[in-house]
């Protein structure tokens, strides 16, 4: 990279009329450095068994989301400023209790481990963890064919969000 930086600087001096050239070169260099870090971040075998167990990676129902949470922590450790992970299957219009109870089990342990891990490593105050969806749920049960479906419709006017770290005051509730 040093040789490349030297060549880029020499080229930029020869072409001062291209002011955006330096920014473009820096962007490419950053992308390269980030790509070089990826193999180390996704190789979770280097994590102690105790850590992998805390994230639920040894249990079928939590392994997938646990892997995402642990990789997210490792990306943050490497300086990545924004990490998004995903947990699907929450759009339950019927059989809400059954559907959500299994989804909750798949994310509870990994999310807890992520927050505890960030705190233990002294990273939680500088890292904002946000858990949210794109809409809330109506307060009443859906009715399908005259039968209550024990689910909820979409509510675009309300939603639930959990935030931890990043200077957010513990126990804060906004709204009613």
Tell what function each PLM region has.
Residues 1-176:
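Ligand-binding pockets and gating/stacking loops
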């Amino acid at each position: 990279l040093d040789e490349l930086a030297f060549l880029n600087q020499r080229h930029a001096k020869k072409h001062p009329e291209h002011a955006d050239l330096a920014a473009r070169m820096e962007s490419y260099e950053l992308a390269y450095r980030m790509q070089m870090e990826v193999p180390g971040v996704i190789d979770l075998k280097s994590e102690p068994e105790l850590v992998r167990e805390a994230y639920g990676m040894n249990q079928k129902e939590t392994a997938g989301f646990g892997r995402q949470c642990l990789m997210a922590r490792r990306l943050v450790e490497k300086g990545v400023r924004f990490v998004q992970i995903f947990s699907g299957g929450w759009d339950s219009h019927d059989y809400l209790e059954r559907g959500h109870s299994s989804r909750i089990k798949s994310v509870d342990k990994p999310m807890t481990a992520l927050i505890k891990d960030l705190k233990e490593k002294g990273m939680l105050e500088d890292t904002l963890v946000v858990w949210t969806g794109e809409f809330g749920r109506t307060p009443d049960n859906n009715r399908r064919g005259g039968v209550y479906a024990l689910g909820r419709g979409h509510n675009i006017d309300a939603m639930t969000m959990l935030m931890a770290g990043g200077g957010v005051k513990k126990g804060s509730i906004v709204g009613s």
